[in-house]
Regions:
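Charged catalytic and DNA/RNA-contacting regions of genome-maintenance
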Residues: 1-317, 330-346, 350-440
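Glycine/charge-rich, flexible interdomain linkers and switch-proximal surface loops
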Residues: 442-451
Length: 451
């Protein structure tokens, strides 16, 4: 148990799923919580002490079924894998935590709503001002804000984070109140040092300063954002290059509504039995990306007259041109969730099939953009598109027409791309014919007919 106890000490707030052979095991209080949450058998293991240690586990192939249930129950889950082949090691197998899954750090489809974001937040206060940072690791969206409680509370209501990172030594009741039903995650106070936060952000974005992001006059927002990125690192979330920028939230650009206004307007739900929220009435979007965007628009109405005008002009164009607008809706309805698909690819959580689907989607978007060319209210959207023609051509030429979900399954690369790969495939598929060919060639070369 020495190895287990050492790893558990590194992740005291998480349920540690400890890989033992073909099972994930939990011990002690973790086992009690796991057995209760998953409704599995709780047993005991003799540890040589006066009392036996509680034990609960499940087969490793059931991880995708059980892990989301633990996270939905409000637990943080640390997944500990065997880092060596047990058959090749004498003694204790080396183990390590490879991933931490929390309510705010989730990629598993059963933990995410396709039509709404899943934000992880961080809060940091100094006097009357509060810094806020929000990231959705499944889409790469990253926001930061700074202001008094009256400004931060509406942002928290609009984004509704599922988990909030905070300074566990701060002791601020107002921050606790802001968290609402979100899962709290406390970090040590050194994580919230401004110099550390600035360096963390600058290193991530590869910039000398944060002025280009509009954060040079928002030190508390910088601290919150830096703490958020540190938390991702701590959770073994090593691949996060898809988080490419951070956007400053400002009260002058949007109408921010407090929790009472949102509730009374019934924007996202109804207090009446059988009732629905305004979002359910308005949402006729063609795909999950549109649904998440509409939810954002409803939670954060625009105040900028020019931005409002552009949006209204685009809607007016669609109403006046039903045929191209209808075809556009049909194409958008065909698309996969591009934001989350791209994130899975960037973080190494998917494979060739998603990559080909992404390339096909980009090609369809390019076709749609060509068809909509000349629609002046949409020009600002069309001009922002990168056709990625060379990338699409490479994917089309390299990947098989129906590649596997995972690269390890084989068959991802199309025939003719790599002669050596084609030769190995032929050997695997028809070794006898290859050997007969070699035999025939050697017989002809040597003049010996019966090799």
């Amino acid at each position: 148990m020495t190895q287990y106890n050492a790893l558990k000490a590194e992740y005291p707030e998480a349920l540690l799923l400890f890989r033992v052979g073909d099972f994930y095991e939990t011990f002690g209080e973790d086992a009690v919580s796991t057995a209760k949450a998953l409704d599995i058998v709780l047993t005991k293991r003799s540890n040589g002490a006066a009392a036996d240690m509680p034990l609960a586990g499940f087969p490793h192939h059931a991880l995708d079924a059980y892990m989301p249930r633990l996270v939905k129950a409000g637990f943080k889950v640390a997944i500990c894998e065997q880092l060596e082949d047990p058959k090749s090691v004498k003694g204790i197998v080396k183990r390590g935590v490879t991933e931490v899954v929390t309510p705010g750090i989730a990629h598993h489809e059963t933990l995410l709503s396709a039509r709404s974001n899943n934000f992880l937040a961080a809060l940091h206060a100094d006097g009357p001002l509060i810094g806020l940072a929000l990231v959705d690791v499944s889409t790469g969206e990253f926001f930061a804000a700074e202001g008094p409680l009256g400004e931060i509370d509406p942002w928290m209501q609009s984004f509704k984070p599922s988990e909030v990172v905070f300074n566990r030594r701060a002791g601020r009741d107002d921050l606790r109140a802001l968290m609402g039903s979100a899962v709290p995650s406390g970090l040590e106070d050194w994580v919230f040092a401004r110099e550390f936060a600035s360096r963390t952000l600058s290193d991530h974005f590869g910039t000398a300063s944060l002025k280009g992001f509009g954060l040079d006059d928002a030190p508390l927002a910088v601290v919150a954002a830096g703490a958020l990125l540190h938390y991702l690192r701590q959770a073994q979330y090593a691949k996060w290059d898809h988080i490419e920028r951070i956007q400053r939230l400002r009260p002058a650009t949007h109408l921010w509504m407090d929790r009472f206004t949102v509730r009374n307007l019934e924007l996202f739900g109804s207090a009446h039995p059988g009732g629905v929220g305004l979002i359910d009435v308005l949402d006729a979007t063609a795909n999950p990306m549109g649904a998440r965007l509409l939810r954002r628009w409803l939670a954060m109405p625009l105040l900028d007259p020019q931005a409002l005008g552009r949006r209204h002009d685009a809607v007016a164009w669609a109403l006046a041109h039903p045929e191209p607008a209808g075809r556009a809706a049909a194409v958008l309805g065909e698309l996969p969730d591009l934001e989350r698909t791209a994130t899975r690819l960037a973080t190494g959580r998917t494979g060739p099939r998603d990559l080909r689907a992404l390339a096909h989607a980009v090609a369809r978007i390019n076709e749609l953009a060509s068809e909509l060319n000349g629609a002046s209210p949409l020009e600002h959207l069309l001009e922002a598109l990168d056709p990625l023609e060379a990338w699409c051509a490479d994917i089309d030429a390299t990947l098989a027409s129906d590649p596997p979900v995972l690269l390890a399954k084989g068959g991802a690369i199309a025939a003719g791309v790599d002669p050596e790969l084609d030769r190995y495939r032929l050997l695997k598929r028809d070794a006898r014919s290859v050997l007969e060919g070699i035999l025939q060639a050697e017989s002809e070369r040597s003049g010996i007919p019966s090799l």
